[in-house]
Swiss-Prot record:
Coiled coil: none annotated. One of its GO terms (molecular function) is bis(5'-nucleosyl)-tetraphosphatase (symmetrical) activity. It catalyses: P(1),P(4)-bis(5'-adenosyl) tetraphosphate + H2O = 2 ADP + 2 H(+). The keyword Hydrolase applies. This is Bis(5'-nucleosyl)-tetraphosphatase, symmetrical. The keyword Hydrolase applies. Pfam families: Metallophos. Keywords: Hydrolase.
Length: 273
């Protein structure tokens, strides 16, 4: 039994299936951890979701910002846009079943035995592991509940970029969503910058990659995350493992096998249909 990690599939079904074959993933005995953004940008979001649903006993999924966007579009909270490639999903007969499954997935995964953490974007430098688990669970309860559309209607907010214990519940949820699904850069005081998406090689102080801010994560933990394709070519310190290599932008998909610490790659296929 092996554990594989991947992120930011973004509807690139063809590349995803090729990478599973290349990495010798066995859907009868192995496990696949996916750090979010299953959908959008690429052409085959519905195929990706259906395939993952068929593997649901062998996978652990973290929701990313694009997955939340799909749920919001489906529920009428957000407008569908051409670049989402959601039309096929929205007209599918099984979309309710798939949405109800998707919105019950996690925001954070932690394996305390193997010392593994997985988040789509990262973990606030202000939080220890227990705090991160607490606020991830708070989001998960809202998403999996019957009033999930009301939650999504109120939770998206760029202005909540700081953490303190006096935040009201809604602002706490807004901050937590931003951390887990959208964070890239922080200021030295750990405030979030939710605008800049550039490579750290092109960005100057006071913007600092979140994983270079002093944090409260125990040193023995490995942290897997996606969301940030422009990290390609940037030296990221251990124990952080970025997985987004920009397949939907013409880059590649990256997969990491835990047991032997081996990477596998699959380049974008130009004739992707």
């Amino acid at each position: 039994m092996s554990i594989y990690f991947i992120s930011d599939i973004h509807g690139c079904y063809k590349e995803f299936k090729l990478l599973l074959k290349k990495s010798f993933f066995n859907d009868k005995k192995d496990f696949l951890w996916i750090a979010g953004d299953l959908v959008s940008r690429g052409p085959d979001s519905l195929k990706v979701i259906r395939y993952l649903y068929s593997l649901r006993k062998r996978i652990k999924i973290i929701l990313g910002n694009h997955d939340l966007n799909l749920i919001a579009v489906y529920s009428g909270v957000k407008e569908n846009k051409k670049e989402n490639y959601f039309d096929e999903f929205l007209s599918a007969k099984d979309n309710l079943q798939l949405i109800n499954w998707l919105r019950c997935q996690s925001i954070l995964k932690i394996d305390e035995e193997r010392k593994i953490i997985m988040s789509h974007a990262g973990i606030s430098p202000k939080w220890d592991i227990d705090t991160a688990k607490k606020y991830a669970l708070e989001i998960e309860k809202c998403l999996s509940g019957k009033n999930y559309s009301s939650f999504l209607r109120s939770v998206f907010n760029n202005k909540i970029n700081y953490w303190n214990l006096n935040l009201n519940k809604l602002d706490r949820l807004r901050y937590s969503i931003n951390v887990f699904t959208r964070m890239r850069y922080c200021y030295p005081d750990s405030r979030l910058n939710l605008i800049c998406k550039k490579s750290p090689n092109l960005v100057k102080y006071p913007l600092i990659p979140w994983f270079k801010i002093p944090n409260k994560i125990p040193k023995e933990y490995s942290v897997f995350f996606g969301h940030w394709s422009s990290l390609i070519g940037t030296k990221v310190p251990q124990p952080f493992f970025p997985l987004d290599s920009g397949c939907c932008w013409g880059g590649k998909l990256t997969m990491f096998r835990w047991e032997d610490k081996k990477y596998f790659f699959q380049s974008f296929q130009k004739n992707n249909s």
